[in-house]
Amino acid sequence: MKIGVIGAGSWGTALANVVAANGHDTTLWAYEPELVTGMAATRVNHLFLPGIELHPGLNYTGALAEAVSGAELVLLVTPTQVMRNLLADLAGSIAPTAILASASKGIELGTLCTVSQICCQVLGDAVRERFVALSGPTFAKEVALGLPSLIVAGSANDAAAHTVQAAFSNPVFRVYTSDDAIGVELGGAVKNVIAIAAGISDGLGFGHNTRAALITRGLAEMKRLGRAMGAQDATFAGLAGMGDLVLTCTGDLSRNRTVGVKLGQGLTLEVIMAEMRMVAEGVKSAESVNALAQKLGVEMPITQKVYEILYGNKPARQAVLELMSRDLKPEQA
């Protein structure tokens, strides 16, 4: 199968490496010209995945049209906030029968659209039947190192989901399918916001009890938003929900948790972001997910407090204490 991967950050590079190692004709597009040149010369992504040699069959390009020309599967792995403009540039080059998959995890600012909704708006509603959301508890570095990992491919089209499953699966990378694309997308977006909250708690030194509570109540927020968007509760109990949430809230490789830890330790967002080369999607998602929750009338208090810390200059300790002093009520999923 001919596959084009758009986005050579750590996650895009790791996924491109998986399908190339599986024997597929794979081309990875990178925005940075020096990254294309460097990967072609050394087979290492020195910017985003240093120290890991990539499969010799993986091809590299800085030309979008070249990356997707003749591709039967196009995988989008860029920050959500640049997705719309990128798709507009790709529109004339993607084959009308190509499966369009996304491993990006976020909600677009302003429009409050998921990636699938952006794809339909830019490329036409027919894309919905060819769209697959790819998400799960996976750190790019561990996938690139060949450590056993599991992920889920969600699509309204069972055949499209199974095509992606077959393309990516191997003895150390197992792919499940789901018919709940919107649930898979939302799980990936919301968990990044909750991971910032968990990191803030850790940075404040609040301990394991607090983190466990944030993860559990964060899952409840994820499910409430999912119901309002037409997702299935079961999705959030699986790899794209609880699985990814636990990993991102506890793993030291989590960029979003790292942002939270530093916020809890007293650093400003500006200083934190200036130190980071790679994107922490949760910073933008806190704004868009909070706005989406307000638009749909969904109660998401943890998400709201993360938003207030990031964009309202609310002290982190005060935000956590405000969560603890909310009206007492029965536990609701």
Swiss-Prot record:
It holds the Pfam family NAD_Gly3P_dh_C. It comes from the Bacteria. One of its GO terms (biological process) is glycerol-3-phosphate catabolic process. Sn-glycerol 3-phosphate binds at residues 105, 136, 138, 191, 244, 254-256. Its EC number is 1.1.1.94. It catalyses: sn-glycerol 3-phosphate + NAD(+) = dihydroxyacetone phosphate + NADH + H(+); sn-glycerol 3-phosphate + NADP(+) = dihydroxyacetone phosphate + NADPH + H(+). InterPro entries: 6-PGluconate_DH-like_C_sf, 6PGD_dom2, G3P_DH_NAD-dep, G3P_DH_NAD-dep_C, G3P_DH_NAD-dep_N, NAD(P)-bd_dom_sf. Keywords: Cytoplasm, Lipid biosynthesis, Lipid metabolism, NAD, NADP, Nucleotide-binding, Oxidoreductase, Phospholipid biosynthesis, Phospholipid metabolism. The active site is at 191 (proton acceptor). It is found in: Cytoplasm. It is an enzyme of class 1 (oxidoreductase). One of its GO terms (cellular component) is cytosol. NADPH binds at residues 10-11, 105, 140, 255, 279, 281. GO terms for molecular function: glycerol-3-phosphate dehydrogenase [NAD(P)+] activity; NAD binding. Pathway: Membrane lipid metabolism; glycerophospholipid metabolism. Catalyzes the reduction of the glycolytic intermediate dihydroxyacetone phosphate (DHAP) to sn-glycerol 3-phosphate (G3P), the key precursor for phospholipid synthesis. NCBIfam families: PRK00094.1-2, PRK00094.1-4. Belongs to the NAD-dependent glycerol-3-phosphate dehydrogenase family. HAMAP family: NAD_Glyc3P_dehydrog. This is Glycerol-3-phosphate dehydrogenase [NAD(P)+]. It comes from Trichlorobacter lovleyi (strain ATCC BAA-1151 / DSM 17278 / SZ) (Geobacter lovleyi).
